[in-house]
Amino acid sequence: MNCTKCRLHRYRTNPVPGEGPLDTDVMVVGEAPGRNEDLQGRPFVGAAGQLLNKLLLDAGLRREEVYITNIVKCRPPGNRDPKDDEISACLPYLLRQIELIKPKLIIALGRHAARVLLEQAGHKWHSMSKQHGHVYDGVISGVRLRIVVTYHPAAALYRPQIREALEKDFAEVIRREVERIRRPSSGEKRGSSQARQTSLLDFFKK
Ligand code: URA
C-alpha cells in the first residue's frame, strides 16, 4: 500500500490497512493507527488492542476470527484526531473492504468510526453517550449489515465509567448480535476467501 492521497503518508512508518480473515461476518473499525500500530503495520497491537482482545472474548469472539481495521490507515502525527479531509481521502479503502468482506456486523469503536459508519448507512450521529450500545441497520457498499456503536477502548483505559459501559456493550449487545448472526437460519457466507484475499491485496497496491 503506497497511498499518497492525504498528508498522513508523510509521517507513517507503515500503513495499517487491516488484518483478519476475509470470510468473517464481523468487522471491527477503530479510529487510526497509534505508535505501536505504525511501527508494526498491524491494527490494535498496543494497550487498547489488549483491551479489545479481552472485550471480543466477552462477546464470544476471538480476535483471529474478526477483521480489524481503522477509519484512516496511517498514523496521524502525535496521535491527533484524523482531519475531515484525511477521513474522506481514506474512505474508499474502507468502503472497498466492506464490499469485499461483506460483514453482517460492524463494531464501530469511538466517535470517528461511529460518525462515519452511521452516516454511510443513512443514520444521524449525535453523541457517544446517547448512542453507544445501540444497533443500526443499514446498507454500505451494497452490503446489508448492522452497526453497533461503542466507546473506543483507549478512552476506557483510564476511565472506569467508560470501561464499565464498554464492557457492558460487548458482553450484552455485541454478544447478542453475534449469537443472532450465528444462528443456522442466518445463511452461509458466499464466495471464496482466497478470491477475496487476492482482490483486496490488488486493491491496496493501486
Ligand atoms: N487505536 C485505534 O483506533 N486503532 C488502532 O489500530 C490502535 C489504536
What is the predicted role of each segment?
Residues S185-Q194:
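Intrinsically disordered, low-complexity regulatory segments in eukaryotic proteins
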